[in-house]
Amino acid sequence: MIDGAPPSDPPEPSQHEELPDRLRVHSLARTLGTTSRRVLDALTALDGRVRSAHSTVDRVDAVRVRDLLATHLETAGVLAASVHAPEASEEPESRLMLETQETRNADVERPHYMPLFVAPQPIPEPLADDEDVDDGPDYVADDSDADDEGQLDRPANRRRRRGRRGRGRGRGEQGGSDGDPVDQQSEPRAQQFTSADAAETDDGDDRDSEDTEAGDNGEDENGSLEAGNRRRRRRRRRKSASGDDNDAALEGPLPDDPPNTVVHERVPRAGDKAGNSQDGGSGSTEIKGIDGSTRLEAKRQRRRDGRDAGRRRPPVLSEAEFLARREAVERVMVVRDRVRTEPPLPGTRYTQIAVLEDGIVVEHFVTSAASASLVGNIYLGIVQNVLPSMEAAFVDIGRGRNGVLYAGEVNWDAAGLGGADRKIEQALKPGDYVVVQVSKDPVGHKGARLTTQVSLAGRFLVYVPGASSTGISRKLPDTERQRLKEILREVVPSDAGVIIRTASEGVKEDDIRADVARLRERWEQIEAKAQETKEKAAGAAVALYEEPDVLVKVIRDLFNEDFVGLIVSGDEAWNTINEYVNSVAPELVSKLTKYESADGPDGQSAPDVFTVHRIDEQLAKAMDRKVWLPSGGTLVIDRTEAMTVIDVNTGKFTGAGGNLEQTVTKNNLEAAEEIVRQLRLRDIGGIVVIDFIDMVLESNRDLVLRRLTESLARDRTRHQVSEVTSLGLVQLTRKRLGTGLIEAFSTSCPNCSGRGILLHADPVDSAAATGRKSEPGARRGKRSKKSRSEESSDRSMVAKVPVHAPGEHPMFKAMAAGLSSLAGRGDEESGEPAAELAEQAGDQPPTDLDDTAQADFEDTEDTDEDEDELDADEDLEDLDDEDLDEDLDVEDSDSDDEDSDEDAADADVDEEDAAGLDGSPGEVDVPGVTELAPTRPRRRVAGRPAGPPIRLD
């Protein structure tokens, strides 16, 4: 729609049929070329009802609205023409002024409604006085000659571009792309802009064509000098001081601006300056840092995320469920003391501890004098080096390899640093003495992990010197947590904090008080020894406190009233456990049992305690990569440098009724429980990613995730289940307790260095003789073995004979005899002698047979490939892009693959038989005289070409 067009005539009655019977308000507004607000106002004026843009109106109301809006438009157009009619008849001074004055629209009221599809008809309107332009006649007169030529060649509806004034473009261009003459470069910038507008006011509706690509219907299209100046003032921006020389004229308001005009200045960002100074980009390419310690900030973020997740996380188990599951599980601890029989330290003793729940091993620990754990030991170390960029310090603890102390593990209150100025280089200096505790054993090339936040573990609680808060395990019921809080208010000293363990459930106040007093006395002894060593300045690290053996630690942390019994095999282990339990928990002595391995009547030794409880068998299966589920599914556990990945497969489990969703969900539920058991048994720590089989229903996915979370409630170490990723992967983190099962009983392979592969200098050809790749698995295993055995039997039954001439070869003689018998039967009808057929058979070149066999083989492969492609397409359509075919491994279900294997094997035999017919020296295989190879019916495509049978009539 073009401004200046007069209102069209009222619609004819025939136009009423163009509107539908019923339409919405916004559709009617779009049809009439106006806004929904004006249509709603017209409807309210007609019947007084309040409607919205989505209300429905019938054809009668739509016609009334159209007539009403057309009447208002016609009245507004007549009034506008009558007011300015005397001024429009004035004679302009020149043709240029005529074109300029007739097309200027300054503050002239435009009709709000214009019917669609009406041809634009310009009407004469006067030129309103422009208050913003002071020297309009001067520059119009100066440029009349130059613009006259441009107006003669310019079309009436030429679209003008805003290339010079658009965002992101320079303002120093003075080209003639908009019809401006070259000699305008000497004029002020304001005069250039306004002269261009005066020369092209006939197409002012296209000033903002780059902003509105859809058309010119809903835009204000006046094109006057005042409107153009306002738009230019809004878009005017001042560049930086290092801009072009042409921007000097833009410092401050332009001459055509009214008084008190504000020029907005866009201050570039620091990132933009850095990016533009190098490569002109708008994004920052510099690495940014944070104020303070990065590790402390990461620690704060983890705490915030943990608190937020704790608020959103629903309770995993209620108190009743917690107590019921705790009492329902039968827990037994078995300890075995053995002598090492393999190098490098044969003859040394080691101890194994296994925790069984309902007869299934869920946790395993191993300890020896040579591989004692350092976790919990307290040392007076000496700072060797401080790395501010890594926010870490290396501390000598007297164990050969330096330990690493990160900034997040520094006790800042003890160091006298608080607030934001927490930098490790301010707290520690090389040569300083520092009391540290080992929080993680050295692994591989990494040293021990250290912390200055010392904690002493007791039987019922953990004593934290210098802390001011108390914590209670979330695994305890709410009522028990409240009881323990009241006890701690009276027991815990003001200069220390405690963390209540799950073993303190139901414990009396006197026992907790005694545990706190014992741990506090131990800490005072450690402080006194550290102070004495500092005064001596011996210059060497000193061990202030060492944790007891792993056997004692496991008994202290795990063995409580929940266990049915503790079975011990070995005199040394029995003496250690019996002495500790009598001193710490005399009420649990009745649950101790010593296993005696008496010899049998025939002199054979009794089975081992681990053999009796089938622990060795379960440990051997736990060291395998693949784990079988009770229903037949499998888990594949792979350990990488960054994380542990677990893949869930259905394996042999095909379901017992129901549909695929039920089968997959049942398999995933079993996998969730077994995954938690494997994590505890193998002591897997770090990031764990689980790939469950895809489920369609959201309720089933929530059920599997809930089962996984409930199973993890039995794990005593710290863990956290994160959200499910967009790919359907479940990710969680778990803290390792000690040495893992596989790490304790394995070493890296000397051949492949633990990679599991052997590298060769040349590429390895993994293709079989048939030209197809060998596919490992159970689908083709049976059939492939059968085919190979039959092929080997065929080869064993043939004899090696010298090469014959083509005509004397026994194969051709047998073929000739067969053809002669066929010809003999056909002589009665056709009368052809059999000798001719024999001659034709004898004269046939051997290459024809070779080609025939090759053609049969190629035809077989093509047919099988077509069938396989069809099956694959059908599977893709049925699964709807769900990746279930990799997870669902159904054995012996693809008969087409077996048939293709049979055809390929037959084709191989045919090729081998025909290989020696080309006259090459050597030996060929011929059937033996005394034994015949077993035959098998062959498929049609392998025996003869496709088509109807050929009759020799």
Swiss-Prot record:
Its main location: cytoplasm. Zn(2+) binds at C749, C752. It is found in: Cytoplasm. The keyword Zinc applies. Binds 1 Mg(2+) ion per subunit. Residues 127-150, 199-223, 848-915 have a biased composition (Acidic residues). Belongs to the RNase E/G family. This is Ribonuclease E. The lineage of its organism: Bacteria, Bacillati, Actinomycetota, Actinomycetes, Mycobacteriales.
